[in-house]
Amino acid sequence: MGRGKIEIKRIENANSRQVTFSKRRSGLLKKARELSVLCDAEVAVIVFSKSGKLFEYSSTGMKQTLSRYGNHQSSSASKAEEDCAEVDILKDQLSKLQEKHLQLQGKGLNPLTFKELQSLEQQLYHALITVRERKERLLTNQLEESRLKEQRAELENETLRRQVQELRSFLPSFTHYVPSYIKCFAIDPKNALINHDSKCSLQNTDSDTTLQLGLPGEAHDRRTNEGERESPSSDSVTTNTSSETAERGDQSSLANSPPEAKRQRFSV
C-alpha cells in the first residue's frame, strides 16, 4: 500500500518533530548533492534547527557561493536603479515631444523666444516644401497613369475598328436597286391623261340599269309612258353616246402609246 498524504502543518509533539526534522534535513542535503552532481550546478544549503544548530552544504564552498550571491544582489539593485533612471529619461523625452507637437500645431508658443520662433518657422517652411514636392510627385504619377490608360483605350478602340472592318469585308453589301423587269416612267400630274373626276364620270356612264318594282301591268304602262317621254331626245342621247365613245377611243390609244408619242401629241 502507498503512503498516505501527510497534512502540512506544525507537528505539536516535540519528539516527533525532531525525528521528522532529522529525516527531512538528511533528504534535503542528499537532493542538493544529487542536483549539483547531475546538473553541474552550484548549490549551497544552509539550515538552522529550532535549537539554533547549523547544518550546511555547498558544492563549491560556502564563502564563494555567498560572495557570488552578494555580487548578484548588488548588480540586481544597480540594474533596477538604472532602469528607473532610464524610465525618467524617457518620460522627459516624451513630455518634450508632446510640447514640440503642440508648437508645430501653433499652440503653446508663449514660452518661446524670438530665435526659437524663427527656428520653428524654418522647420514649418521646410516641412511645407517637402509636402508640396510629395504632392507634385503624386499628381505627376497620377497624370502619367491616366495617359497610359488613355493610350491603352485608344489602342483597344483601334483594334475593335479593324475587327469591325474585317467583319464587314466578309459580309455581302446590301444595296437597294430596281429590278430590270420593272420599268417606271415619271409623268407630270398636270399632263396626266385621266384624272380622278374623269374616271368617276366614265365609271358612272358605263351602265344605265334601273330597277322598278310593281305589278306586271303597271310596269308595262310605265315603260310605255317613259318611252314616249324619251323619244323626242333620242337624237341627243345618240350624239352624246357617240362623242363619249370617240373620247374613250382617243384615251385608250393615248394610254397604250409610248411616252414619246404622248409628248408629241401634247406638243401638237
From Swiss-Prot:
It is found in: Nucleus; Cytoplasm. Residues 1-61 form the MADS-box domain. Induction: By auxin (2,4-D). Feedback loop leading to direct down-regulation by itself. GO terms for biological process: cellular response to auxin stimulus; embryo development ending in seed dormancy; floral organ abscission; fruit abscission; fruit dehiscence; gibberellin catabolic process; negative regulation of DNA-templated transcription; negative regulation of floral organ abscission. GO terms for molecular function: DNA binding; DNA-binding transcription factor activity; protein homodimerization activity; RNA polymerase II transcription regulatory region sequence-specific DNA binding; sequence-specific DNA binding. Expressed at low levels in flowers and siliques. Also present in seedlings. Detected during embryogenesis and accumulates during early seed development (at protein level). Expressed in shoot apices and the base of leaf petioles. CDD domains: MADS_MEF2_like. The keyword Lyase does not apply. Disruption phenotype: Early flowering under short-days conditions (SD) when combined with AGL18 disruption. Decreased ability to produce somatic embryos in vitro. GO terms for cellular component: cytoplasm; nucleus. Residues 233-244 have a biased composition (Polar residues). It comes from the Eukaryota. Gene3D superfamilies: Transcription factor, MADS-box. Residues 80-170 form the K-box domain. Keywords: Activator, Cytoplasm, Developmental protein, DNA-binding, Flowering, Nucleus, Repressor, Transcription, Transcription regulation. Residues 218-232 have a biased composition (Basic and acidic residues). SMART domains: MADS. InterPro entries: MADS-box/MEF2_TF (IPR050142), MEF2-like_N (IPR033896), TF_Kbox (IPR002487), TF_MADSbox (IPR002100), TF_MADSbox_sf (IPR036879). Its main location: nucleus. Residues 205-268 are annotated as: Disordered. Pfam families: K-box, SRF-TF. Transcription factor involved in the negative regulation of flowering, probably through the photoperiodic pathway. Acts both as an activator and as a repressor of transcription. Binds DNA in a sequence-specific manner in large CArG motif 5'-CC (A/T)8 GG-3'. Participates probably in the regulation of programs active during the early stages of embryo development. Prevents premature perianth senescence and abscission, fruits development and seed desiccation. Stimulates the expression of at least DTA4, LEC2, FUS3, ABI3, AT4G38680/CSP2 and GRP2B/CSP4. Homodimer. Interacts with SVP, AGL24, AP1, AGL6, AG, AGL1, AGL11, AGL5, AGL16, SOC1 and AGL21. This is Agamous-like MADS-box protein AGL15. The gene is AGL15.
